[in-house]
Amino acid sequence: HGEYRRQRQMCIRDRSLTLFEKIINKEIPAEIIYEDDVSIVIEDINPQAPTHLLIIPKKVIPKLSDASNEDQEILGHLMLVAGKIADQLNLDETFRLVVNNGAKAGQSVFHLHLHLISGRPLNWPPG
């Protein structure tokens, strides 16, 4: 078991950083709207609406389905940040939060993030 653990730690240590980790680490620039100890909010570089923000936890959770019980506080925090940002931007309770889980659902960066979308009619069902 010791060798397995050592190799697993090497894989974790040697993996390349996601785009969001590089933004969180200030290695690449982004339009930061909000930041606290747990999360960061940036403008989407490919907006699908007049307002399209990404709410990203600083802890790396690849997909929502990878979240564990210990992530409950982080997940709740992301929702509260979304509400706070929507209020600050005067979105008048007219916005949508989206989480894509996995490539087939449209997830392109494997670091959990919420899309906050507003500023145009949002049809149902989405997609």
PLM features: residue spans?
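Short histidine-centered catalytic/ligand-binding loop motif
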Residues: 55, 59-74
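N-terminal first-folded block
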Residues: 15-51
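Conserved His + Asp/Glu catalytic blocks
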Residues: 13-15, 19-24, 117-127
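Long, well-ordered alpha-helical scaffolding segments within enzyme catalytic domains
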Residues: 72-88
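C-terminal structural segments of small proteins and small subunits
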Residues: 92-125
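Single conserved hydrophobic/aromatic residue that forms the stacking wall/gate
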Residues: 1-12
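Divalent metal-coordination and catalytic microenvironments
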Residues: 26, 41, 57, 78, ...
